[in-house]
């Protein structure tokens, strides 16, 4: 593969059995996509990962751009329709279809990537950028990223499943207004399950479940590990049953979150 540009969004602890058990080791594996004489955009770094990327880029003479340093996104906010509004250096206000908090860092990365592609000859107009941000789901088929399922009670799903993704989800949940939080949670067996569960809000009512894939951890085991993290709830053998229970228990002013695994979200979306 000979790309015109490479992008590495961020580094988090995931797939550690394949990528390594430190951020530096994972970054080294991810840096393998950096190609000779090809610009690369790095979305987010840590003190551990930044020198890894810089060294690899220097070895293959790849121009490297750190999106956090270019900082083409000035700030973001949510409008009344739940769309995220980005104040940007190059395009003033951009309306984004994806409302998830993690999209702020992603957008900053995208803006750096767009500028590079334009500089190497891609005919990307402002109208293209606005259309892409405003209609990313319909244009790409993307689903399950802080996706609103229903109102009263408000139900949202998100496929974030590692500590990096869950950190954004927990922060965004803390920004919501609700009477009671209900969380439908299932996980697969190759993640940092205890680490993720320890991050979740203890005041929520939990519905532990199992996605319809072989890698899914049993609902009983999720419940056991969650109990060690101070989380309480009942178990349900399928995502559909867990969601029905949450809906039955929730009042109109409550909030239902469905996540923990891409496969849990997939089971939800396939049942709609």
Where are the language model's segments positioned?
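Acidic, Mg2+-coordinating active-site environments of NTP-dependent enzymes
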Residues: 3, 7-87, 107, 111-127
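Active-site-proximal loop/hinge segments that shape catalytic or ion-binding/gating pockets
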Residues: 261
């Amino acid at each position: 593969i000979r790309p015109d540009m490479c992008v590495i969004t961020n580094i988090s602890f995931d797939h550690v059995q394949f990528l390594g058990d430190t951020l530096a080791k994972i970054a080294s594996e991810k840096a393998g996509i950096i190609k000779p004489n090809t610009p690369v955009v790095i979305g987010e770094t840590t003190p551990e990962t930044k020198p890894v990327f810089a060294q690899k880029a220097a070895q293959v003479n790849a121009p490297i751009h750190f999106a956090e340093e270019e900082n083409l996104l000035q700030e973001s906010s949510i409008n009344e329709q739940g769309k995220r509004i980005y104040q940007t250096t190059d395009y003033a206000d951009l309306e984004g279809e994806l409302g998830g908090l993690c999209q702020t860092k992603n957008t900053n990365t995208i803006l750096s990537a767009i500028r590079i592609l334009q500089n190497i000859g891609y005919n990307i107009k402002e109208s293209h950028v606005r259309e892409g941000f405003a209609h990313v789901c319909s244009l790409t088929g993307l689903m399950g990223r802080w996706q609103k399922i229903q109102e009263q009670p408000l139900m949202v799903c998100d496929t974030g499943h590692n500590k990096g993704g869950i950190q954004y989800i927990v922060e965004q949940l803390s920004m919501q207004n609700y009477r009671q939080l209900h969380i439908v949670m299932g996980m697969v067996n190759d993640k940092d399950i205890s680490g993720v569960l320890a991050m979740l809000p203890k005041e929520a009512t939990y519905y532990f479940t199992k996605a319809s894939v072989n890698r899914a951890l049993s609902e009983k085991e999720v419940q056991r590990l969650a109990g060690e993290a101070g989380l309480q709830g009942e178990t349900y053998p399928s995502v559909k049953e867990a969601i029905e229970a949450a809906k039955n228990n929730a009042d109109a002013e409550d909030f239902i979150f469905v996540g923990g695994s891409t496969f849990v979200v997939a089971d939800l979306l396939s049942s709609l």
